[in-house]
């Protein structure tokens, strides 16, 4: 599985709304994301696992 990089655009309740570097929009439940995820965070989705990237 190819790694996919996302930027969190907004958080509404229990869901984060994000856009990949390829422009694909996605919505993910916050409990699945790493602690510290916030609007503007960069995330990596690889091997069915989320990683919060350093700023």
Which sequence ranges carry the predicted segments?
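Short aromatic-glycine-enriched beta-strand elements
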Residues: 14-18
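Short, Lys/Arg- and Gly-enriched loop/turn segments at beta-strand edges
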Residues: 47-55
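Structural detector for short beta-strands of small beta-barrel domains
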Residues: 1-11
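Short, structured beta-strand/loop micro-motifs enriched in basic residues and often containing a Trp
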Residues: 20-28
């Amino acid at each position: 599985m190819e790694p996919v990089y996302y930027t969190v655009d907004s958080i509404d309740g229990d869901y984060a709304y994000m856009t990949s570097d390829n422009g694909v929009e996605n919505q993910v439940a916050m409990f699945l994301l790493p602690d510290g995820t916030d609007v503007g965070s960069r995330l990596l989705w690889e091997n069915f696992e989320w990683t919060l990237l350093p700023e």
